[in-house]
C-alpha cells in the first residue's frame, strides 16, 4: 500500500419518572426510548427489547417526531435521521466508535492495515491501487462498502455521483476471505449478545441466533471482548467479527448500538446496549457528530421536528 498523509501519526486517532436500573447498579433508565426510523421491524424489535421497562416512542414517517418526554431519553435512530434531528436543534448526545478505533487495533486482531481519512484524499492515490473502501459510519448510497480495483477511480466516481468530499472513509489493503460473520454487542467490556449474520455467503434469516452455531458464538464473543480490551472503547458498542477460511478470527468493523441491526441477538440485552450508548452520555472522544455527507443531505431536507 502506498504511504499517505494518514500514515504520519497512526495513533492520532409518553412520560415516566426515573425507574429502577435497566442493566446493573447505577445504570440509567430512560424516560423513553425514541425510535426514529421508517422500518417497522426496528420499532418491533425495540419494543420487544424494552419489555415494558419504559415507553418506546416510534416515528416512522421521517417527517415529524413526537415531543420527547421530560428527562433523559434513549435513541434508536439511523445516522441520517440523527443528522436531521441535529439540524432541528435537538442536542443529541450519542456514543459511537470513532474512525481511529478500528485502525488502531493491533494487526493480529484485524489481519490487515486500515487507514482513515476523507473521500477527496483518495483521488490522489496512485493509479490501479486496489483496496477495500467503505464509509466510516455514514450510509452513502453512491459509495458502497466493497473491494475496488482502483481506489482513486472509485473515489472519483463517488464524488461525481454526489458524495461529499469530506465523507469519512476507511481503506484496507486485504480482501478478507470470511466463511462466517457474527455481530457482537459489548457492554462494559463484556459480550452480552450476539448473532451470526453471514454464513458461507448466505445472509441472516429468521432463526439464526446465538444458539445456531454455539462453538462459533463462544469464540466470536471471546474475540470481540479481546478487541475491546486492547485499548480505549466506548461503554457500549457493536463489534462485527469474522471467521477466516484459515480458522482465525478478525475484527470486521465496529458500529453504534443505537443504529445497528440486531439480527438474532437477545433483544432485551440489545436495548440495554442502546440505552448505554444513547442516554445521558457525557461529552467524550466517543461523542457522535454527523458525517459531512449526511449533514449535507440533512441541510437540504426539512428537519425532523416535534409535532
PLM region spans:
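Nuclease-adjacent, charged terminal/linker segments that flank catalytic cores
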Residues: 35-36
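Conserved metal-phosphate-binding beta-hairpin within the catalytic cores
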Residues: 192, 233-264
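A long amphipathic alpha-helix within ATP-dependent nucleotide-binding catalytic cores
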Residues: 198-248, 273, 278, 295-306
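Short, low-complexity, intrinsically disordered N-terminal peptides in bacterial proteins
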Residues: 1-14, 299-307
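Active-site nucleotide/adenylate-binding loops and adjacent lid/helix of ATP-dependent enzymes
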Residues: 2-3, 7-9, 18-30, 39-226
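C-terminal appended segment following the main domain
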Residues: 255-307
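Residues at beta-strand starts and edge strands
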Residues: 14, 180, 235-237
Amino acid at each position: 500500500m502506498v504511504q499517505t498523509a494518514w500514515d504520519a501519526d497512526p495513533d492520532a486517532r409518553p412520560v415516566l419518572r426515573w425507574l429502577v436500573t435497566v442493566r446493573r447498579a447505577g445504570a440509567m433508565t430512560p424516560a423513553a426510548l425514541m425510535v426514529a426510523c421508517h422500518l417497522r421491524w426496528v420499532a418491533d424489535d425495540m419494543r420487544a427489547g424494552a419489555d415494558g421497562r419504559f415507553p418506546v416512542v416510534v416515528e416512522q414517517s421521517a417527517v415529524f417526531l413526537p415531543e420527547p418526554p421530560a428527562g433523559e431519553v434513549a435513541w434508536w435512530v439511523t445516522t441520517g435521521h440523527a443528522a436531521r434531528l441535529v439540524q432541528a436543534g435537538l442536542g443529541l448526545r450519542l456514543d459511537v466508535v470513532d474512525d481511529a478505533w478500528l485502525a488502531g487495533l493491533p494487526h493480529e486482531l484485524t489481519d490487515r492495515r486500515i487507514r482513515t481519512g476523507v473521500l477527496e484524499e483518495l483521488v490522489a492515490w496512485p493509479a490501479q491501487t486496489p483496496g477495500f473502501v467503505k464509509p466510516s459510519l455514514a450510509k452513502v448510497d453512491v459509495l458502497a462498502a466493497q473491494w475496488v480495483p482502483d481506489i482513486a477511480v472509485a473515489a472519483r466516481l463517488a464524488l461525481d455521483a454526489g458524495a461529499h468530499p469530506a465523507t469519512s472513509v476507511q481503506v484496507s489493503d486485504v480482501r478478507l476471505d470470511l466463511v462466517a460473520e457474527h455481530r457482537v454487542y459489548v457492554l462494559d467490556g463484556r459480550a452480552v449478545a450476539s448473532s451470526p449474520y453471514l454464513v458461507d455467503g448466505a445472509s441472516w434469516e429468521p432463526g439464526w441466533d446465538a444458539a445456531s452455531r454455539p462453538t462459533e458464538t463462544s469464540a466470536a464473543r471471546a474475540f470481540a471482548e479481546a478487541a475491546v480490551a486492547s485499548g480505549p472503547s466506548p461503554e457500549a458498542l457493536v463489534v462485527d467479527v469474522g471467521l477466516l477460511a484459515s480458522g482465525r478470527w478478525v475484527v470486521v468493523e465496529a458500529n453504534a448500538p443505537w443504529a445497528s441491526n440486531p439480527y438474532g441477538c437477545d433483544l432485551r440485552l440489545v436495548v440495554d446496549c442502546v440505552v448505554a450508548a444513547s442516554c445521558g452520555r457525557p461529552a467524550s472522544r466517543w461523542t457522535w457528530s454527523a458525517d459531512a455527507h449526511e449533514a449535507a443531505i440533512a441541510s437540504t431536507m426539512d428537519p425532523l421536528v416535534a409535532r
